[in-house]
Structure formats: structure tokens, C-alpha cells
Amino acid sequence: MSELDAAKEAGIFLLGNTNDAYAQYFSGQSYLNPLVAGPAIPVNVGNVTFEPGCRNNWHRHINGGYQLLLVTAGKGWYQEAGKKPQKLTVGDVVVIKEGVKHWHGAAKNSWFAHVAITAGASEWLEAVSDEEYDQLPDA
């Protein structure tokens, strides 16, 4: 079984399609399965899956924004600017308040998936450099 097939089976939600709309804000390949969206719902809810080593850029949620991450598969990382990275595993929950600069993504050798519940707008910033990322220990 390929790693992609294993990742599809490990998650509780479908993998979704390649995350082409946001690819410019990611280092590596991610997949997005929108779970809840619509004008009557004030948040977006989606399952995001990251290939090993994939991570998003530094970013923050603005205009009344916040984000909740519910880890559903694999191993990954979350880091706020100026703080140490936090290792993430299945069952972890991350609460990200408005304006907090952060990034999240997969460990070097693991697929990673989370449900992201996001309100407001996202302000995308610089990429997490390979040098920064390579300093992380193996998860």
C-alpha cells in the first residue's frame, strides 16, 4: 500500500483534492476537503491533510478571526512566533486567537491531518524556511 493510500485510510474524513487554491501558501503538497461552508455559516470547516514535510506559511487570522485545529491523523507541528514548536498527535486541539502569528504542518516523516475551523480572514506571511523547519526534531 502506498503512503498516500495509507493516509486516505487513516483519516476519518475523505482526503479531498489537492489544495491548489492555497498552494502558494504551503511548502509541499496539501489536500483540502471542505466539510462545512456557506453564507449562513460564519466559519469555514475543512479537513486539511499534509504530506510528510509539508507546512503552511506563517500567517494570522484577522477581522474577528480565529482558528481551531482538531488533529485527526499522523504527527505534526504547531508554532507561534517567538515560542517553541509544539508536537501534535491525534486528539490534540489547538486554539489560535485573533492576530497570533503561527504556522502548522506535518512532521518530516509523517502524514498529518487536522480539521480546521476558521473564522475571519487569513493574512498570509512569509514561508517557514527549510532552515527553521529542519531544526525540528523527528516527531
What name fits each language-model region?
Residues 1-43, 57, 124-139:
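A short, N-terminal "cap"/entry segment at the start of jelly-roll beta-barrel domains
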Residues 84-85, 90, 98-123:
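Ligand-binding loop in jelly-roll beta-barrel domains
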Residues 46-62, 98:
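Conserved short histidine dyad/triad with adjacent acidic residue
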Residues 32-33, 78, 114:
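Short hydrophobic/aromatic-rich beta-strand segments that constitute the beta-sheet cores
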